[in-house]
Curated annotation (Swiss-Prot):
This is Uncharacterized protein RP600 homolog. InterPro entries: Rhodanese-like_dom, Rhodanese-like_dom_sf, STR4-like. PANTHER family: RHODANESE-LIKE DOMAIN-CONTAINING PROTEIN 4, CHLOROPLASTIC. Pfam families: Rhodanese. SUPFAM superfamilies: Rhodanese/Cell cycle control phosphatase. It comes from the Bacteria.
Length: 123
């Protein structure tokens, strides 16, 4: 199964309505601090694992979400590129319900993104 692209508004709806859904934000620590992060009422549904230059990404991911092989996992970055790569990587190790939030946190050339779509976020 391949990674599916999904817009931020649909991903948010699925995240808040499904107890088995998780958000993995793969941006850098600097991006989280300077631009903001998504806000979900259930903090246990959010993982912050920087993808860039992180040789421990797989180990860190598995240490947190190892027992949730059937979970629905949404990957988020600034504009949808890094998150797509991370989602593919995790799909290749056995997780089949991976989605790339294609418009990202800040948007891309075609779409607004999490923040500009007025979805909950915070610093």
């Amino acid at each position: 199964m391949s990674v599916q692209n999904i817009c931020s508004t649909k991903a948010y709806d699925m995240l808040i309505s499904n107890d088995n859904a998780f958000l993995v934000d793969v941006r850098t620590r600097e991006e989280w601090q300077q631009v903001g992060i998504p806000h979900l009422d259930n903090k246990n549904k959010m993982l912050f694992l920087s993808w860039q230059l992180n040789k421990d990404f797989e180990d860190n991911f598995l240490s947190i979400i190892n027992d949730k092989i059937h979970a629905i996992i949404f990957f988020l970055c600034r504009s949808g590129y890094r998150s797509f790569i991370a989602a593919n990587f995790i799909t290749n190790i056995g997780y089949k319900n991976c989605y790339n939030i294609s418009d990202g946190f800040e948007g891309n050339n075609q779409d607004k993104g999490w923040k500009q779509n007025n979805l909950p976020w915070q610093f």
